[in-house]
Amino acid sequence: MSTTKLTRREQREHAQRFIDTLAGTAFPNSRRIYVHGSQADIRVPMREIQLSPTLVGGDKDKPRYETNEPIPVYDTSGPYGDPDISIDVRQGLAKLRQPWIDARNDCAPLSERSSAYTKARLADDGLDELRFSGLLTPKRAVAGKCVTQLHYARQGIVTPEMEFIAIRENMGRERIRSEVLRQQHAGEGFGAHLPENITPEFVRDEVAAGRAIIPANINHPESEPMIIGRNFLVKVNANIGNSAVTSSIEEEVEKLVWSTRWGADTVMDLSTGRYIHETREWILRNSPVPIGTVPIYQALEKVNGIAENLTWQVFRDTLLEQAEQGVDYFTIHAGVLLRYVPMTAKRLTGIVSRGGSIMAKWCLSHHQENFLYQHFREICEICAAYDVSLSLGDGLRPGSIQDANDEAQFSELRTLGELTKIAWEYDVQVMIEGPGHVPMQMIRRNMTEQLEHCHEAPFYTLGPLTTDIAPGYDHFTSGIGAAMIGWFGCAMLCYVTPKEHLGLPNKEDVKQGLITYKIAAHAADLAKGHPGAQIRDNAMSKARFEFRWEDQFNLALDPFTARAYHDETLPQESGKVAHFCSMCGPKFCSMKITQEVRDYAAKQSIEAGMADMSNNFRARGGEIYLKQEEA
């Protein structure tokens, strides 16, 4: 990892150059494909990795090859992964879902913004240079209508978003013909239902039951539909956002694009610094993935960082502001109740959630119940009008191994289950946030408790970190826990970067965190037995055994690092066709030796077969033609 430290000005200039030169880019030897649905505007993007053929025989002059079919993989990069699409972040992305939203005739443009804060920002000419120029006119559900995907699902309606998701979740595996690639071990799903083929109707059923959510605000039409649920692929979230001391709008847009390139299924904007409103607008207009926020952060900024001065009115205005910009899901810490706060007094690390600590301080200062809990039904009404999903925050999550699975954590979890049922009364989509810091032997209980008390709503966890002794490597400590809880049924994993507990992550940290968590999510899919999850592994193993080095690089989650590590010791082009690597060398490569053994065994088998035929021939008297026996 590079240790070169850029100045603040250099970081911002680098981000500006990135934005100015941004273009759709494919991974090495990959191409963008689109799988079409039942109507012309359902075009589901995937990345197809092209592979080289396998040498199967012949001689030096006339070698004989066998084709290796391309491998389709899930792609979160949106237009940024398509070289044929022109990118201009100042214009934003195409509004993919706008025709679907308009066709439902259940929402209408607003004549003015509902948020007083938004109105004030728009009236401030001093912000013109920072403001995204192509502002949308926000929409809201018309009176008496509900615009959530949960509402449609409960009405028996299969939306275009649901069909898009069904195609996407199947990952193009119906295109794979090779029996070698299709082989897969049986998994242990711990009660998950994983059909061989995901249909739009199955997606609808899961959403209707509350077991899955489709974060898709009607004011974020640029987003490509995706789903979060135990019976689908495990998803990964990346956190970005500025702080009071670092980052800029340019850098956050760069981190957004970078996150989607490296596999972020959703992105949370956790900005706490200046220009939060303007930064979020730039992010939303350029994001092909759902965007989540923690509204209490911005609400706190509006009262100058003094938690005691927070009010429901300020928070409500913040919800309206963000919903009309297009935020797809809100983290709401409504389960931090006044009576739970004393339970944290005996903890080693107390309350470590920012949102949880803000609400705990407010409750103690006023000696009143959490206003998010008291006004939860009003929160649901707002979410239902824009289709903002709720991510019920775990404000009392454990911040150390010592505090794992304690009374405070599980008391809050049970309250989140109660709030889930209330949200469902309003047809609002819900997922539940989880820990945190949990040792390996205690992780599964978190999943079983959540399923029981939160009625199978999707679980979304931060890790969990399995040990506290590795600052600088907490993407590893948490990746272990993430893989485990993903296997047990967690639907989405919030990444942890190497900077966890140390500082705000930069672009390279974002990549490191995402690669770690894509590994964890994929390992969980394999363990669950998700249909088709093993195809890419099989393709990699076949390429590895056949010494197809270029294919090994290209099939990797990070082709660039794989190639760089190989080329550190074998940089010559001849090293890309060598039947060994620098680990063992030519004489001790186990796969080379195995191939020689296999070839020898095959040759021996042929020779033995020829000998048997020769013996049979002589036993029959050496006659070329045998007389037919009479009946």
From Swiss-Prot:
<keyword id="KW-0408">Iron</keyword>
<feature type="binding site">
    <location>
        <position position="297"/>
    </location>
    <ligand>
        <name>substrate</name>
    </ligand>
</feature>
<dbReference type="InterPro" id="IPR037509">
    <property type="entry name" value="ThiC"/>
</dbReference>
<feature type="binding site">
    <location>
        <position position="501"/>
    </location>
    <ligand>
        <name>Zn(2+)</name>
    </ligand>
</feature>
<protein>
    <recommendedName>
        <fullName>Phosphomethylpyrimidine synthase</fullName>
        <ecNumber>4.1.99.17</ecNumber>
    </recommendedName>
</protein>
<feature type="binding site">
    <location>
        <begin position="394"/>
        <end position="397"/>
    </location>
    <ligand>
        <name>substrate</name>
    </ligand>
</feature>
<feature type="binding site">
    <location>
        <position position="333"/>
    </location>
    <ligand>
        <name>substrate</name>
    </ligand>
</feature>
<dbReference type="GO" id="GO:0016830">
    <property type="term" value="F:carbon-carbon lyase activity"/>
</dbReference>
<feature type="binding site">
    <location>
        <position position="584"/>
    </location>
    <ligand>
        <name>[4Fe-4S] cluster</name>
    </ligand>
</feature>
<dbReference type="GO" id="GO:0051539">
    <property type="term" value="F:4 iron, 4 sulfur cluster binding"/>
</dbReference>
<comment type="function">
    <text>Catalyzes the synthesis of the hydroxymethylpyrimidine phosphate (HMP-P) moiety of thiamine from aminoimidazole ribotide (AIR) in a radical S-adenosyl-L-methionine (SAM)-dependent reaction.</text>
</comment>
<keyword id="KW-0862">Zinc</keyword>
<keyword id="KW-0004">4Fe-4S</keyword>
<dbReference type="Pfam" id="PF13667">
    <property type="entry name" value="ThiC-associated"/>
</dbReference>
<feature type="binding site">
    <location>
        <position position="589"/>
    </location>
    <ligand>
        <name>[4Fe-4S] cluster</name>
    </ligand>
</feature>
<dbReference type="GO" id="GO:0008270">
    <property type="term" value="F:zinc ion binding"/>
</dbReference>
<comment type="similarity">
    <text>Belongs to the ThiC family.</text>
</comment>
<keyword id="KW-0949">S-adenosyl-L-methionine</keyword>
<dbReference type="InterPro" id="IPR002817">
    <property type="entry name" value="ThiC/BzaA/B"/>
</dbReference>
<dbReference type="InterPro" id="IPR038521">
    <property type="entry name" value="ThiC/Bza_core_dom"/>
</dbReference>
<feature type="region of interest" description="Disordered">
    <location>
        <begin position="54"/>
        <end position="80"/>
    </location>
</feature>
<comment type="subunit">
    <text>Homodimer.</text>
</comment>
<feature type="binding site">
    <location>
        <position position="460"/>
    </location>
    <ligand>
        <name>substrate</name>
    </ligand>
</feature>
<feature type="binding site">
    <location>
        <position position="437"/>
    </location>
    <ligand>
        <name>Zn(2+)</name>
    </ligand>
</feature>
<keyword id="KW-0784">Thiamine biosynthesis</keyword>
<dbReference type="InterPro" id="IPR025747">
    <property type="entry name" value="ThiC-associated_dom"/>
</dbReference>
<feature type="binding site">
    <location>
        <begin position="353"/>
        <end position="355"/>
    </location>
    <ligand>
        <name>substrate</name>
    </ligand>
</feature>
<keyword id="KW-0456">Lyase</keyword>
<keyword id="KW-0411">Iron-sulfur</keyword>
<feature type="binding site">
    <location>
        <position position="581"/>
    </location>
    <ligand>
        <name>[4Fe-4S] cluster</name>
    </ligand>
</feature>
<keyword id="KW-0479">Metal-binding</keyword>
<feature type="binding site">
    <location>
        <position position="268"/>
    </location>
    <ligand>
        <name>substrate</name>
    </ligand>
</feature>
<feature type="binding site">
    <location>
        <position position="239"/>
    </location>
    <ligand>
        <name>substrate</name>
    </ligand>
</feature>
<dbReference type="Pfam" id="PF01964">
    <property type="entry name" value="ThiC_Rad_SAM"/>
</dbReference>
<feature type="compositionally biased region" description="Basic and acidic residues">
    <location>
        <begin position="58"/>
        <end position="67"/>
    </location>
</feature>
<dbReference type="GO" id="GO:0009229">
    <property type="term" value="P:thiamine diphosphate biosynthetic process"/>
</dbReference>
<comment type="pathway">
    <text>Cofactor biosynthesis; thiamine diphosphate biosynthesis.</text>
</comment>
<dbReference type="GO" id="GO:0005829">
    <property type="term" value="C:cytosol"/>
</dbReference>
<dbReference type="GO" id="GO:0009228">
    <property type="term" value="P:thiamine biosynthetic process"/>
</dbReference>
<feature type="binding site">
    <location>
        <position position="433"/>
    </location>
    <ligand>
        <name>substrate</name>
    </ligand>
</feature>
